Design a protein with these regions (language model features):
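Generic alpha-helical propensity signal that fires on short helical segments
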Residues: 42, 47, 51, 80, ...
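Amphipathic protein-protein interaction modules
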Residues: 64-116
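Polybasic, proline/glycine-rich intrinsically disordered low-complexity segments
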Residues: 2-6, 17, 21-22, 34, ...
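N-terminal low-complexity, intrinsically disordered segments
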Residues: 1-66, 95-97
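Generic structural signal of hydrophobic/aromatic residues within well-ordered alpha-helices
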Residues: 29, 33, 37-40, 53-57, ...
């Protein structure tokens, strides 16, 4: 048995994970995608960030009105991308050339897919 494993065994009791994690729902799954979309938009449009996207935006030297329009373009692009991916995973839209239902499960093996479409519409169109 390697030394690193012996050391890990001695402290593994400190990092006990619960026997089972709470079931993730389709709603929570979609919420996480929405949070990611919002986070990316904030990062892309934050003058202080050093992302490639922000660097390219800065290089265009846009005025305030142009920056506002670009932010709307980025938001719409991210919204449509995330929404299409979610619908594709739920079998309601094609991903590339294929349209099929994918089984998405949480860490406990509970099925998440099958109810994504409705929540995706709610979070990416009704709440926008």
């Amino acid at each position: 048995m390697p030394d690193w494993y012996k050391k890990w065994q001695n402290v593994s009791h400190i990092y006990k994970l619960p026997a089972s994690f709470p079931k993730m729902t389709a709603k929570e799954f979609v919420e996480n995608f929405k949070l990611e979309k919002d986070s990316l938009l904030k990062e892309f449009t934050n003058i202080e960030s050093h992302t490639e996207v922000q660097n390219l935006i800065q290089s265009m030297k846009l005025n305030e009105e142009q920056s506002k329009i670009l932010k709307q373009i980025l938001s719409s692009t991210l919204r449509d991308t995330f929404y299409t991916i979610l619908l594709g995973l739920d079998g309601c839209s094609a991903i590339g050339k294929s349209q099929e239902l994918y089984e998405i499960k949480d860490e406990n093996g509970n099925l998440i897919s099958g109810e994504i479409e409705g929540y995706a519409y709610e979070y990416f169109h009704e709440m926008e």
